């Protein structure tokens, strides 16, 4: 098989990140230098982001039977790269106080983002499985990076067990689908499923297994078991990557699979997905109510956000508005999560014990770090879906899609979930403005806004507000990513 220059251009983000992985590996082997390797990683990710412009000029194409590069792939590749960039940026000050080898952290983030890009472009079940493994395996190491802390090591082991269970279910489901249809390509699967094969027991069993596997990866109820423990134990920059890049990449490939293969046409599958979405929204929000640890709280809130997205996924057969809703919602979720976890990262460092994840650490933050408190408040309001923030636009889209598709009980769940969510997000926001404790046990650096991590947090807050007030540029961008399917 010969690859044309056009196809090489279409693969540029993947090739650039792959090349960066090799360069960083060689750089570590040659000489350990934290600043040099962090810079190389950030430059590589930035170059991959810039290359998306050239990919757009090349147009939509099937590069290999495993991958399709189009507007959809470009949008989600861009979001994954932004999340990876933010992770590296937050990790630099966090790793400055780390006693052991710092450089491998960037290497693992780059390999995981490579998996994310592969997932965004995947057009075949083999690429889906490869991408999921490529994004999961580096995370085992990243979650346990602060291995001197018991919680970090525990989180790593729990995530490894969860991942192994998910992969085995997923692989078995893929095998059953292949046994029945003889195809692994999304398009060919779509044709097989279109020929009234959706009632075949083997096919339904395969789909069920895949839903279980992907449910583990997306931390949907009832497959969310140790998700909050993993968020709590992982270093703050890794929690950022877990909440954003890994979720966005996996959700994008699930959406492409549902677009090509009309899985939602089966009433049984729709009911199962509906129950999972309903349970994720209600359970995620109810469990977050009692949390006093901000990383656990954000872990439970990520379960409910994925539940909201599932509503749009179930309504996918009802037109392109669902795809638009998912694109806008994920962009809002990305920037809100980057800001929230960014603040936690700025307040944390490995040599001061566990991360600053207790709500008490943020009490009265406004009185000595007013701008940082304002940023955190904006992020909490956006995650809660308050008007004038990007989170509201995403929630509004999901509600509109639910109403349009006639998913009344799921739309009611979104409304109830948002009402419950309002309480615990505002609890975090209000604690920032209470009187500060006598002795500050945690604080961000004095000049935090001049650090790279601080700039990322401020830009995220600005984008959440700007797109919340005037969302048209973002909506146009998401719409442009759709017709190239």
Curated annotation (Swiss-Prot):
Its main location: membrane. Keywords: Cell inner membrane, Cell membrane, Membrane, NAD, Quinone, Translocase, Transmembrane, Transmembrane helix, Transport, Ubiquinone. The lineage of its organism: Bacteria, Pseudomonadati, Pseudomonadota, Gammaproteobacteria, Enterobacterales. It holds the Pfam family Proton_antipo_M. HAMAP family: NDH1_NuoN_1. NDH-1 is composed of 13 different subunits. Subunits NuoA, H, J, K, L, M, N constitute the membrane sector of the complex. One of its GO terms (biological process) is ATP synthesis coupled electron transport. The keyword Transcription regulation does not apply. It is a multi-pass membrane protein. Its EC number is 7.1.1.-. The keyword Translocase applies. It is found in: Cell inner membrane. One of its GO terms (cellular component) is plasma membrane. Belongs to the complex I subunit 2 family. It catalyses: a quinone + NADH + 5 H(+)(in) = a quinol + NAD(+) + 4 H(+)(out). This is NADH-quinone oxidoreductase subunit N. It is an enzyme of class 7 (translocase). NDH-1 shuttles electrons from NADH, via FMN and iron-sulfur (Fe-S) centers, to quinones in the respiratory chain. The immediate electron acceptor for the enzyme in this species is believed to be ubiquinone. Couples the redox reaction to proton translocation (for every two electrons transferred, four hydrogen ions are translocated across the cytoplasmic membrane), and thus conserves the redox energy in a proton gradient. The chain crosses the membrane at residues 8-28, 35-55, 71-91, 104-124, 125-145, 159-179, 203-223, 235-255, 271-291, 297-317, 326-346, 374-394, 408-430, 455-475. One of its GO terms (molecular function) is NADH dehydrogenase (ubiquinone) activity.
């Amino acid at each position: 098989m010969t690859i044309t220059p056009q196809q090489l251009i279409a693969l540029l983000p993947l090739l650039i990140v792959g090349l960066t992985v090799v360069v960083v590996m060689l750089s570590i082997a040659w000489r350990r230098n934290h600043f040099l390797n962090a810079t190389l990683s950030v430059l590589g990710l930035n170059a991959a982001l810039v290359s998306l412009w050239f990919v757009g000029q090349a147009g939509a194409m099937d590069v290999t039977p495993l991958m399709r590069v189009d507007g959809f792939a470009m949008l989600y590749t861009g979001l994954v790269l932004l999340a990876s960039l933010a992770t590296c940026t937050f990790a630099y000050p966090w790793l400055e106080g780390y006693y052991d080898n710092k450089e491998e952290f960037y290497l693992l983030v780059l390999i995981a983002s490579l998996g994310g890009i592969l997932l965004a472009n995947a057009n075949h079940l083999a690429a889906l499985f490869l991408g999921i493994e490529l994004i999961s395996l580096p995370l085992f190491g990243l979650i346990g990076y602060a291995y001197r802390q018991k919680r970090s090591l525990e989180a790593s082991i729990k995530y490894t067990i969860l991942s192994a269970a998910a992969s085995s279910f997923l692989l078995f489901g893929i095998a059953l689908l292949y046994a029945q249809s003889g195809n692994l390509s999304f398009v060919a699967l779509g044709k097989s499923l279109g020929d009234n094969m959706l009632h075949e027991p083997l096919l339904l069993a395969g789909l069920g297994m895949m839903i279980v596997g992907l449910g583990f990866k997306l931390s949907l109820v009832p497959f969310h078991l140790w998700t909050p423990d993993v968020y709590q134990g992982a270093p703050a920059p890794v929690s950022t990557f877990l909440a954003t890049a890994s979720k966005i990449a996996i959700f994008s490939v699930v959406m492409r699979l549902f677009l090509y293969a009309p899985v939602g046409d089966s009433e049984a599958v729709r009911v199962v997905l509906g129950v999972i979405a309903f349970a994720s929204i209600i359970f995620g929000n109810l469990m977050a109510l009692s949390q006093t640890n901000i990383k656990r709280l954000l872990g439970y809130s990520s379960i409910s956000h994925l539940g909201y997205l599932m509503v749009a996924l179930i309504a996918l057969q009802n037109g392109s508005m669902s795809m638009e809703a998912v694109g806008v919602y994920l962009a809002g979720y990305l920037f809100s999560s980057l800001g929230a976890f960014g603040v936690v990262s700025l307040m944390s460092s490995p040599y001061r014990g566990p991360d600053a994840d207790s709500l008490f650490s943020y009490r009265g933050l406004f009185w000595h770090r007013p701008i940082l408190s304002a940023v955190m408040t904006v992020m909490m309001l956006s995650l809660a879906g308050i008007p004038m923030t990007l989170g509201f636009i995403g929630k509004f889209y999901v509600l509109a899609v639910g109403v349009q598709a006639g998913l009344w009980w799921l739309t009611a769940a979104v409304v109830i979930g948002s009402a419950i969510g309002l309480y615990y997000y505002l609890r975090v926001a209000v604690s920032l403005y209470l009187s500060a404790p006598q002795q500050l046990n945690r604080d961000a650096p004095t000049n935090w806004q001049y650090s790279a991590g601080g700039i990322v947090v401020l830009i995220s807050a600005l984008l959440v507000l700007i797109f919340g007030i005037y969302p048209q540029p973002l909506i146009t961008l998401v719409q442009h990513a759709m017709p190239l399917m």
